[in-house]
Design a protein with these regions (language model features):
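Beta1/beta-strand and adjacent pyrophosphate-binding region of the FAD-binding site
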Residues: 2-15
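N-terminal glycine-/charge-rich "phosphate-binding" loop or analogous flexible N-terminal tail
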Residues: 13-19, 23
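Glycine-rich flavin
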Residues: 2-5, 21-28, 32-155
Length: 155
């Protein structure tokens, strides 16, 4: 027997996770299915912007701007900073931490709003008068079925 939800959102990017949270706030039982996995093997909600686009690029940009200020602009303020070096591996590590903090924040919002998160790839399996059955394949290739009265495709 598959788990039944009022709404199933396929995709945990900026459109999907917000749709899932809002549906839950409106009193619906909601599941969100997303297959993205971070470097640590854990779910990486938030879509392209959060994981490989806007957020990581802005984190790296901020680090490089601090480097530029230390090298070129501190002296204007009477601050002497000699032999300033860039540690790219630390910059990357900081960027990864910022991304993880965003991923974890979305998972927290799901928990707070009672959205069931399912880590896997969803595919339509069948339909009947009461909704749609989705087959969700996890990274370990196990498959579970869930049913939703309404499906939001946000991929």
């Amino acid at each position: 027997m598959s788990k039944q939800f009022d709404v199933v959102v396929i995709g945990g990017g900026p459109g999907g996770y917000i749709a899932a949270i809002r549906a839950a706030q409106l009193g619906k039982t909601v599941a969100c299915v997303d297959a993205a996995t971070g470097k640590d093997g854990k779910p990486a909600l938030g879509g392209t912007c959060t994981n490989v686009g806007c957020i990581p690029s802005k984190a790296l940009l901020q680090s490089s701007e601090h480097f530029e200020h230390a090298n070129l602009h501190f002296a204007e303020h009477g601050i002497s900073a000699k032999d300033v070096k860039m540690d790219v591996s630390k910059m990357i590590s900081r960027k990864d931490g910022v991304v993880k903090q965003n991923n974890d924040g979305i998972l927290y919002l799901f928990k707070k709003n009672k959205v069931t998160f399912i880590h896997g790839r969803a595919a339509f399996a069948k339909t009947d008068g009461g909704g749609y059955t989705l087959a969700v394949t996890a990274n370990d290739k196990s498959v579970q079925e869930i049913t939703g009265t309404h499906i939001v495709v946000a991929t």
